[in-house]
């Protein structure tokens, strides 16, 4: 680190994040639904990093209005397509960075670090690692919180135990990977650790292999972290990107060849600033639903952003639902995209959904699970799926067919109980990325 950096950190940045002249923070911001809490979160984030080297791009989608001022370090891009453009935007920023920056840190614009020295320590980590997360633990803050409402220290030890960890606290993927490769390879998200929020890498890694940019409804962080660890074809990814595995595996293999499993992290906590209900994000479901549509999106514009005329209704429904911050809005989850294989996929997804709901409530009786299902699914328009789920929940072909109206679905649902012990199973968190 240069002497000038040391002097700045001592005399100018006493209570701020410490700087490093060869490191740069990059980020992208888009808020097509005009969620006011997103802008509030951005302002808190930006106030914490504005004295550091940074480049931010705002993506203005459709006829929505820009929210950030254009400056030397904040630029603006327009696109008509409502997609998750995050990785495409980050890749564009990296391609235009001055060569003096050797270490690149891409952050979500809604995070705060408790470790004021995180940037300097992260650069130190990248002397021996190729990629890293600049935090050990992350916490989802509640609305209007500036600090967690619970004692973090009392939950650190149990953070890898799905049954004991605090529901708003995770250990980072990279911290778990450094402790044990078995932890990071686990199929349970809560065990392998959080994959999002903030990353850092040596510049040459991103120059050689740009971030995976085809996760156009999210999930690229999850793809990247398993790729960095050499988990090619990991079930976390295959169960989500059901139609794009070949392309993802090809990218992941090349990325791992560069990173070679050299993954680091630094001590400290990251706070995720509230800007909406986490339960509305539906990380896994949204990717599964959108997976087949990704094959139809291949064209890019002059800025390197994907453009499309398909999937727009689903994306708009999803973002409207996700970004609605009113507690009494009564909004519904987004529509499901239809395709040739939707019948089979819907059966698989719905069964998985019920299994996950049940595994979260491990002490729930079969009768309670049935009542739970009826409450959350009061009406259905597909008797086969209804009967399959009810046959599975009631463990009865007769009850499943009488209640759902399709004997074949009930038979299959009942039969699935032979291979799935209802009272067991592990907790599966839908927090995909």
Residue positions per predicted region:
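C-terminal catalytic/acceptor-binding lobe
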Residues: 2-20, 31-38, 45, 215-355
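A conserved acidic beta->alpha catalytic loop
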Residues: 29, 34, 48, 57-68, ...
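Active-site-proximal specificity loops/subdomain of glycosyltransferases
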Residues: 60-101
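Low-complexity, glycine/proline/serine-enriched intrinsically disordered segments
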Residues: 335-433
């Amino acid at each position: 680190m240069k002497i000038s950096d040391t002097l700045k950190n001592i005399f100018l940045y006493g209570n701020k994040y410490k700087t490093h002249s060869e490191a740069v923070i990059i980020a992208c911001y888009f808020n097509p639904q005009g969620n006011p809490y997103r802008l509030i979160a951005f302002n808190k984030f930006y106030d914490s990093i504005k004295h550091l080297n940074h480049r931010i791009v705002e993506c203005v989608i459709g006829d929505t209005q820009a929210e950030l001022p254009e400056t030397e370090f904040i630029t603006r891009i327009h696109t008509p397509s409502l997609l998750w453009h995050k990785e495409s935007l980050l890749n564009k920023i990296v391609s235009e960075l001055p060569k003096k920056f050797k270490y690149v840190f891409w952050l979500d614009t809604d995070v705060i670090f408790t470790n004021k020295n995180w940037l300097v320590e992260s650069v130190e980590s990248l002397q021996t690692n190729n990629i890293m997360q600049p935090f050990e633990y992350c916490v989802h803050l509640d609305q209007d919180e500036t600090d967690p409402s619970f004692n973090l220290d009392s939950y650190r030890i149990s953070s890898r135990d799905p049954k004991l960890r605090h529901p708003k606290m995770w250990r980072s993927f990279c911290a778990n990977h450094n402790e044990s490769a078995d932890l990071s390879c686990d199929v349970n998200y809560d065990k392998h650790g959080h994959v999002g929020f903030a990353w850092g890498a040596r510049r040459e890694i991103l120059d050689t292999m740009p971030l995976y940019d085809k996760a156009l409804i999210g999930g690229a962080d999850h793809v990247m972290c398993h790729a960095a660890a050499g988990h090619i074809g990991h079930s976390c990814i295959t169960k989500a990107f059901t139609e794009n595995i070949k392309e993802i595996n090809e990218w992941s293999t090349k990325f791992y060849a560069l990173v070679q499993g050299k993954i680091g992290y630094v001590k400290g906590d990251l706070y995720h600033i509230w800007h909406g209900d986490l339960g509305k994000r539906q990380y896994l479901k949204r990717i599964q639903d959108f997976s087949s549509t990704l094959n139809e999106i291949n064209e890019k514009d002059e800025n390197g952003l994907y453009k499309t005329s398909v999937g727009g209704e689903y994306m708009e429904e999803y973002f409207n639902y996700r970004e609605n911050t009113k507690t009494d809005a009564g909004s519904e989850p987004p529509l499901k995209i239809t395709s040739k294989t939707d019948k089979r996929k819907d059966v698989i997804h719905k069964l998985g959904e019920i299994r996950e709901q049940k595994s979260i409530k491990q002490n729930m009786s079969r009768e309670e699970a049935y009542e739970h299902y009826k409450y959350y699914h009061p009406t259905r328009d597909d008797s086969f799926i209804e009967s399959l789920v009810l046959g599975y929940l009631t463990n009865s072909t007769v009850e499943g067919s009488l209640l759902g109206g399709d004997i074949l679905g009930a038979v299959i649902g009942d039969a699935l109980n032979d291979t799935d012990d209802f009272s067991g199973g592990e907790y599966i968190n839908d927090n995909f990325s």
